[in-house]
Amino acid sequence: AVNRMLAAGAELVLCTGGMSVDPDDNTPGGIQASGARIVTYGAPVLPGAMFLLGYFEDGTPICGLPGCVMYAGATIFDLALPRIAAGVELTRRDFTVMGEGGLCLGCKPCHWPNCPFGK
């Protein structure tokens, strides 16, 4: 499926489901098998610790999205997507430095991005 999307000209590939470490979680292995160079599988950010980012040889990014992106107000994907969309090729260091400020406090109401999350 990933290679079909690339052949169709996708500029960004998003995969979700099965991003944990359970034996039957196949998405990370599928992304790796597609030929992507994995930058990170895991980030010091909650919600979203099981985020995966990779790049194909032509620079096309691929993200493995944990389930939290469907329900949480702000996640690692909210921190990474603007930079990916701007054409910035993120590195492992870009994620490791997110450890400070990487915990969403789940404030009600959510005021992200006007809060310390991801800063």
Regions found by a protein language model. Give the residues of each.
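Short glycine/threonine-rich loop/turn motifs
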Residues: 1-117
